Amino acid sequence: MRNEMTGADPILRRFEGAATAGAAMTDRMPEASPARERPRRDHRRSNPSRTGGGAKRSRWLAPLLAGSAAAVAAAVLYNLRQTKAAERRHPPIGRFLHVDGVRLHYIERGRGEPLVLIHGNGTMIQDFTVSGLVDRLAERYRVIVFDRPGYGYSSRPRGLSTPRAHARLYRDALEQLGVEKAAVYGHSWGTLVAVALALQSPELVRSLVLGSGYYYPTLRADTFLLSPPAIPVIGDAMRYTISPLVARAVLPGMIKQVFRPAPVPERFDRLFPKPLMLRPLQLRAAAEDAALMTPSVMELEHHYGELTVPVTIITGADDQVSDVGRQSERLHRELPGSEFIALPGLGHMIHHLAPDAVIDAIDRTAQRSREEAGYGAAESAANPPPAAL
């Protein structure tokens, strides 16, 4: 079970050992002793100012170093304990699949046409279960949701950071699950994975619904705020010491921001496993996603016209995270035949705030793909489109 939880992060094990050793070392560190005065035998050799300065420095430097080491060790141990407590409280809810050296945590619900849901930055499978989307869609689809690499209980090797890399992993994972063709819904950062999957494996993706996405490069404050823990070595130290503490302080405000102008739903506040978001490995995943978001769309934007599947673009009209005009509306203009839906008065988290609209978009886009595939009358009768909600 340890490999499914904190043991999956090798850096965590090293920090745990180092923190324990550091705490023990600071307990044993002797206090700085006052410098002994030596008789001056040769006034030409002595330097009173230098000798006195060195003694003063030794009196404050040793306690300062000891205090700093103790503070770092205490922060590491506190964060490790918080990580273990979060995982005890919120254990894995699905199964594990090993794909291309990556351990993927996933759930599968329902029967019918395969439908893959891809979550955004900072979240995990529960983003779709808590919203009620999974249970409702499972009434007529085979719903598959993965924790993207580094989130929830999926591992994240170094280098597995771009939407295209995630799309290749999804393709291989779906092949292991026997999925030959699937409808796909991506939300926020997950829209980039969904688009990359449709571009790289058009034979696999039947239809595409893109929710609250980011598709064109613009300056975003969150990319600068979230990126530092992605820096090798320095970022590793940050995410085991100060980053979880800072994230814990700012998380309530960030959650309010993604739901604005609507309030945070009581169900989300009560059921979503927020402590899992503060673990070091997940902070690294979120930081890497933030750092690579703009470079990723700079590459992907040149290929949107190559999409060959039915596409629906859905967003909250008052999204406080992704600029609707510069992102969703522009993509709609550049994708002939796409459908665009802007939900008035809603922000970024549309599947929580308007699940009926998201489900309807998934159903109608999947039906368009059936019609474009030329289903015969017998097939249409056997698989009628779901009633509009």
Where would I find each of the regions flagged by the language model?
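Flexible "cap/lid" loop of the alpha/beta hydrolase fold
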Residues: L199, L208-Y240
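Hydrophobic alpha-helical topogenic segments used for membrane insertion/localization
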Residues: K56-L80
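Acidic catalytic loop of the alpha/beta-hydrolase fold
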Residues: D318-S322, H348
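Active-site loop/oxyanion-hole signature of alpha/beta-hydrolase fold enzymes
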Residues: I107-R109, V145-G186, D360
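Conserved alpha/beta-hydrolase catalytic His-Asp/Glu region
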Residues: L219-T223, S243-E306
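Short beta-strand/loop motif that positions the catalytic acidic residue
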Residues: L307, I313-T315
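Conserved HGGG/HGGXW glycine-rich cap/lid loop of the alpha/beta-hydrolase fold
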Residues: V102, E108-Y153
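Catalytic active-site module of serine/aspartate enzymes centered on a nucleophile-bearing elbow/loop
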Residues: P336-L389
